[in-house]
UniProtKB/Swiss-Prot annotation:
Subcellular location field: Cytoplasm; Endoplasmic reticulum; Nucleus, Cajal body
Pfam families referenced in this protein's UniProt entry, alphabetically: MMR_HSR1
Stored CDD domains: HSR1_MMR1
Nucleotide-binding recorded as keyword: yes
Protein name: Large subunit GTPase 1 homolog
Keyword Transport among record annotations: yes
């Protein structure tokens, strides 16, 4: 049976309702000749929008003000400028960068750190805390006014007052204050006001800038920075925590191998004795050989339990280990004083005094670094017989914790790229008479031009990046094209004929080539540019893509000695030399239409008549047997199938 239809009466009501609705709509907008009481010849008070408006957005406020002023807006369709996506780099032009640098120099004096207010024995703890809060609040307001009025960009800085309180206490009890900076951009991570604050507290305290990751610089680059800081009357030391750790690991492996060889020799010599004699000989021999290592392990365990897992203390109860020593420990401290004095006298005889007056550009080792610290401070010490070195100030990824672990010879501080990872300062004794006072890593305020510079410097986390175009564009501007191609083994698309042939590649060109090479593709089959950007930026921060900022007054292009080592391709047709055994990658053609039109190499035409058969062309003369044999040998006999004399069909062309 077919589908039963609805009764006819059911659709009549809907038809009448639809007709009535259409009539009402048509009469609403048309005039009628019928008489009505609504003349519409006055102000319609019944249809006013009497809704109260107490708050409105900026756009609504602007439109309402324009309506009250009687301003009419007309769309302008002339002078339209389309901004392509590749032009949105987020970088500054040369004129803008020079203007911002001038503003940085003019407002350098406002870039300061909070000071601890003056206090005396009559000041109560509540009054001191309130004064510290007031000074800290005024300092933050000053930085906010600097950003708003001058339109300057500041780096992220520490906004927790408790961290600054620990900074004040560490400076007060330190003899040498060490700032750890990155060798690729020392001026960005240096805080000049911290050096002034140290001298304000005590003129006998010394300031030192420890330039970490100096192994990334060449000897000429280190010499240039040493000369610059020498003119600024600042002591700098070139240091590499990673190289020092590798050297220490190599020494430990050699010592372990030496101990294994000695143990094997001892076992071979005593193999002829019985078990009782062997056990007796081992008990006599092992303590004399392994006692230093056992003592080091015991001290290591004690130090780890004492410093790494120490609970958080109150601010009024912060004391170092030397302040809580008993009478027995005071005798030990007296021995430390005598040994440290003897060491300093011996070192003063060995090392020439001119080393304290000049900055040397060579890369120091761990032992040389400790000797320089001992020679640097010659005034009155905070604690007699003990040299206290305050460390820990610096941005993330500059190597604060790695430096301390390398100096101590084992892991004393956990390493992290997060600011504020160390919650409280701790004292670590390197040797008798030399103490490291590790302060939580404080991030000082500094000037930057763009947010992209902060991302490329490692200040902002790369994984939390919102827009990848400006940082990658900055990488393309700093790293030449041939260095990028040689580092990743890619071919970046060349500029068009109407563009500058020496322009840097855009972020899209670099990320597209890198994404194709690594296989980072989206669901739509396009290169995953944000994912590729994270890999490239991490390589830039880690130093795989190396760019070193020069001292003021030096040319940034000629300062990059590491870029001049790689040969630059002089012509566009040159290809990167590949390793033997690998297939050459296909070059990308920037304009496939022009290449196809002007370079038609395989042009064929359909002709009729006598054609070349078996290598013979009409009018070419007598065909020799050698020519026929060569033609036959060049082909594949198993592909002929007896179709040699048949003409090719036109549909196959």
């Amino acid at each position: 049976m077919g589908r039963r239809r609805a009764p006819a009466g059911g659709s009549l009501g809907r038809a009448l309702m639809r007709h009535q609705t259409q009539r009402s709509r048509s009469h609403r907008h048309t005039d009628s000749w019928l008489h009505t009481s609504e003349l519409n010849d006055g102000y319609d008070w019944g249809r006013l929008n009497l809704q109260s408006v107490t708050e409105e957005s900026s756009l609504d406020d602007f439109l309402a003000t324009a309506e009250l002023a009687g301003t009419e807006f007309v769309a302008e369709k002339l002078n339209i400028k389309f901004v392509p996506a590749e032009a949105r780099t987020g970088l500054l032009s040369f004129e803008e960068s020079q203007r911002i640098k001038k503003l940085h120099e003019e407002n350098k004096q406002f870039l300061c750190i909070p000071r601890r207010p003056n206090w005396n024995k009559n000041t109560t703890p509540e009054e001191l805390k309130q004064a510290e809060k007031d000074n800290f609040l005024e300092w933050r307001r000053q930085l906010v006014r600097l950003e708003e009025e001058q339109k300057l960009i500041l780096t992220s800085f520490e906004r927790n007052l408790d961290f600054w309180r620990q900074l004040w206490r560490v400076i007060e009890r330190s003899d040498i204050v060490v700032q750890i900076v990155d060798a690729r951009n020392p001026l960005l991570f240096r805080c000049e006001d911290l050096e002034c604050y140290v001298k304000e507290i005590d003129a006998s305290k010394e300031n030192v800038i420890l330039i970490n990751k100096a192994d990334l610089l060449t000897a000429e680059q280190r010499s240039a920075w040493a000369t610059y800081f020498e003119k600024e009357d600042v002591k700098v030391i070139f240091w590499s925590a990673l190289a020092g750790a590798i050297h220490l690991n190599g020494d430990s492996e050699e010592e372990a191998n030496k101990d294994d060889r000695q143990s094997n020799t001892a076992e071979f010599e005593h193999s002829s004795f019985d078990e009782a004699e062997i056990s007796h000989s081992e008990t006599e021999h092992l303590p004399a050989r392994d006692s230093p290592s056992l003592s080091e392990n015991l001290t290591t365990d004690e130090d780890d339990s004492e410093y790494e897992d120490c609970p958080e203390e109150e601010e009024d109860d912060w004391q170092t280990c030397s302040e809580e020593d008993g009478p027995e420990e005071e005798d030990c401290g007296q021995d430390w004083k005598e040994s440290s004095a003897a060491d300093s006298e011996a070192q003063s005889r060995k090392t020439p005094q001119k080393r304290q007056l000049h900055n040397f550009s060579h890369l120091v080792s761990k032992q040389e670094l400790l000797e320089l610290f001992k020679e640097l401070h010659t005034g009155r010490k905070v604690k007699d017989g003990q040299l206290t070195i305050g460390t820990g100030w610096g941005y993330p990824n500059v190597g604060k914790s790695s430096t301390i672990n390398t100096i101590m010879g084992n892991k004393k501080v956990s390493v992290s790229a997060t600011p504020g990872h160390t919650k409280h300062f701790q004292t670590l004794y390197v040797e008798p008479g030399l103490c490291l006072c590790d302060c939580p890593g404080l991030v000082m305020p500094s000037f930057v031009s763009t947010k992209a510079e902060m991302t490329c410097s490692g200040i902002l986390p790369i994984d939390q990046m919102r827009d990848h175009v400006p940082p990658v564009s900055l990488v393309c501007q700093n790293i030449p094209r041939h260095v990028l191609e040689a580092t990743y083994g890619i071919n970046i698309i060349k500029p068009r004929e109407d563009e500058d042939p020496h322009r840097p590649p855009t972020s899209e060109e670099l990320l597209t080539a890198y994404g194709y090479m690594r296989g980072f593709m989206t669901a739509h089959g396009q290169p995953d540019q944000p994912r590729s950007a994270r890999y490239i930026l991490k390589d830039y921060v880690n130093g795989k893509l190396l760019y070193c900022h020069p001292p003021p007054g030096r040319d940034p292009v000629t300062f990059q000695h590491q870029h001049q080592r790689l040969p630059e391709n002089k012509t566009n047709g040159d290809e990167i030399k590949m390793r033997p055994g690998r297939n050459k990658k296909v070059k990308q053609i920037e304009n496939i239409v022009d290449k196809t039109f002007f370079h038609q190499e395989n042009v064929r035409a359909l002709t009729k008549g006598v054609q070349a058969v078996m290598g013979y062309k009409p009018g070419s003369g007598v065909v020799t047997a050698a020519t026929v044999s060569s033609e036959n040998g060049a082909g594949k006999p198993w592909k002929k199938h007896g179709n040699r004399n048949k003409k090719e069909k036109s549909c196959r062309l």
